[in-house]
Amino acid sequence: MNQLNTAIVEKEVIDPMAFRRALGNFATGVTIMTAQTSSGERVGVTANSFNSVSLDPALVLWSIDKKSSSYRIFEEATHFGVNILSAAQIELSNRFARRSEDKFANIEFDLGVGNIPLFKNCSAAFECERYNIVEGGDHWIIIGRVVKFHDHGRSPLLYHQGAYSAVLPHPSLNMKSETAEGVFPGRLYDNMYYLLTQAVRAYQNDYQPKQLASGFRTSEARLLLVLESKTASSKCDLQREVAMPIREIEEATKILSEKGLLIDNGQHYELTEQGNACAHMLYKIAESHQEEVFAKYTVDERKLFKNMLKDLIGI
């Protein structure tokens, strides 16, 4: 009889921080999950773990940390709401990502099935009956059966590499196809919003790979550039300037701090000498690309363009 040889294969130790950063390469939408118990306890949490499960029956899922104090209400409530945020709802996302006594204060919302809060101006919303709760490691996976949904069609808020993003057409899409030539140029190519989004897409397509090649992720590079420019005088201002959730700001600042690039002074963050050098390097990359793109325009044309952009932004 042959003796079977058995070997113990050691499992590779997964670094939670590195694992989370790797997962950040998968772009997702941003949702706020809401629920309310029969006694009137209301809860809302920002989540990007939302996904579809089944069409028949219509099932969706999301996950919540077992340590979350909000889980008790989702477990007790018979229904929950999925509010898919639009690109204009970054502040709402940040509000429900933070701990607060009453996140719903001064926020307009309607009540859906089971008295679930449904926010206005979202991209879409799903009213769900709690279907099942499954254990998944350090999270609870909450599955819901969709009983009603609302498709508002607004451009969604995206989340990628620890920062908020927006939808832009892929550069491989050729808008000058034979069938489109006689239809779109006269309308879309005279539309300022369309031209601005296409310009941003074209600019980012070549610029972002150069920035990522520096070794900094989008969230880290954005923080370095904003802090070096000193446009944010406090941590509260910083959140507005970088357009990132508090959790990601904290994670990125922790990484930059561990690299010796940043110091937390309590009310604000300050770059070290090495941090300023890295920010200067990132600015060189940005300025070089800017010069490359705008080389064919005169100084006066560039100045006019910048002034128009600043006027649109309100600065």
Swiss-Prot record:
GO molecular function, one term: flavin reductase (NADH) activity
SMART domains, alphabetized: Flavin_Reduct
Superkingdom as given in the UniProt entry: Bacteria
BP term (GO), one: catabolic process
Pathways involved: Aromatic compound metabolism; 4-hydroxyphenylacetate degradation; pyruvate and succinate semialdehyde from 4-hydroxyphenylacetate: step 1/7
S-S bridge residues: none
Catalytic activity, reaction form: a reduced flavin + NAD(+) = an oxidized flavin + NADH + 2 H(+)
EC number: 1.5.1.36
Free-text activity regulation comment from the record: Flavin concentrations greater than 15 uM do not inhibit the NADH oxidation activity of the reductase component C1 but do affect the hydroxylation activity of the C1-C2 complex. Maximal reductase activity is achieved only upon HPA binding to the reductase component C1 before interaction with NADH. HPA stimulates the rates of both the reduction of FMN and release of reduced FMN from the reductase component.
Principal EC category: oxidoreductase
Quaternary structure and interacting proteins, as annotated: Homodimer. The p-hydroxyphenylacetate 3-hydroxylase (HpaH) is composed of an oxygenase component C2 and a reductase component C1.
Function per UniProt: Reductase component of a two-component system that supplies reduced FMN (FMNH2) to the oxygenase component to catalyze the hydroxylation of 4-hydroxyphenylacetic acid, leading to the production of 3,4-dihydroxyphenylacetate (3,4-DHPA). Catalyzes the reduction of free flavins (FMN, FAD and riboflavin) by NADH. Subsequently, the reduced flavins diffuse to the oxygenase component C2.
Listed name of the protein: p-hydroxyphenylacetate 3-hydroxylase, reductase component
Encoding gene (name): C1-hpah
